[in-house]
Amino acid sequence: MGFLSPMHPCRPPTQRRMAAGNHSTVTEFILKGLTKRADLQLPLFLLFLGIYLVTIVGNLGMITLICLNSQLHTPMYYFLSNLSLMDLCYSSVITPKMLVNFVSEKNIISYAGCMSQLYFFLVFVIAECYMLTVMAYDRYVAICHPLLYNIIMSHHTCLLLVAVVYAIGLIGSTIETGLMLKLPYCEHLISHYFCDILPLMKLSCSSTYDVEMTVFFSAGFNIIVTSLTVLVSYTFILSSILGISTTEGRSKAFSTCSSHLAAVGMFYGSTAFMYLKPSTISSLTQENVASVFYTTVIPMLNPLIYSLRNKEVKAAVQKTLRGKLF
């Protein structure tokens, strides 16, 4: 996602310039993967294959369910269907290649393939960051301004918000991937299981300071804008919920937001651990665990989180199943 700390260690510029003068063009990279232990390759393959299958079924199921049931044709579920699409897409950018690597002797990825993986991963992760923010704003309008909800969150507004979210993802990814394309690489072993910015930057044989600072401020803008919007939205939401006189009303209002809060907490928590810290604080194993969590586990969990406590989704599932069975 590009939340890169400027404290990230790199080789001195003099050493990098010396290397840059002698390096040959890298045409492919080798992904180190999650582990070198041969006895763990098959169990990990089966584990992540299961996670990926659940991710596909869950997110495609959520999108299909929302499309087939007219009672779910509301702004909240329109945004949720796009969130499911993003989860499905960025998981599909990472997981299939990771599964192949578990059963391959050499985890090779071409230069073009690596940069393409980075580009599309960033598109959907940055877009998801802003989509969660849009969903927080939607809940704010629904709870704090219920009488104006249909006017504020009109069909045109929803389409515009989603278009802006994808545009931000495309622009952010283009900038960050473009910076990575300009770097010369003289090493080919990526200490990670996919092509991410931090591991790739370590392979450059020129100074990465300008790239680091550009990516850091770009990512800083993204995370500050989105996190502040979510924080402000839920501050007003909590204030409105506490002002509801009936216990039933408070419970219903809070239940509509609890799922989103859980998704926001998991996503921002894991990405912040990965990118908003000096790399010396955590080990490679800890970074891999955090990275696996937000690239593979969160896309699997989001459909479950939004459906388990949602009466409308449960009712839509029952209606769809009855329609198929009878």
Curated annotation (Swiss-Prot):
Any one biological process term the GO annotation gives: G protein-coupled receptor signaling pathway
GO CC list: plasma membrane
Extracellular compartment spans: 1-45, 101-116, 172-222, 282-287
UniProt-annotated location(s): Cell membrane
GO molecular function: G protein-coupled receptor activity; odorant binding; olfactory receptor activity
Keywords: Cell membrane, Disulfide bond, G-protein coupled receptor, Glycoprotein, Membrane, Olfaction, Receptor, Sensory transduction, Transducer, Transmembrane, Transmembrane helix
Residues of this chain annotated as glycosylated in UniProt: N22
Pfam families, per the entry: 7tm_4
Disulphide-bonded residues: C114-C195
Annotated family: Belongs to the G-protein coupled receptor 1 family.
Domain of life assignment: Eukaryota
Biological role stated in the UniProt entry: Odorant receptor.
Cytoplasmic side: 67-77, 138-150, 244-260, 309-326
InterPro entries, A to Z: GPCR_Rhodpsn (IPR000276), GPCR_Rhodpsn_7TM (IPR017452), Olfact_rcpt (IPR000725)
SUPFAM superfamilies reported in the protein's UniProt record: Family A G protein-coupled receptor-like
Transmembrane segments: 46-66, 78-100, 117-137, 151-171, 223-243, 261-281, 288-308
Name the UniProt record assigns to this protein: Olfactory receptor 8A1
Gene: OR8A1
Membrane association type: Multi-pass membrane protein
Lineage summary: Eukaryota, Metazoa, Chordata, Craniata, Vertebrata
Keyword Ribosomal protein: no
PANTHER family according to UniProt: OLFACTORY RECEPTOR
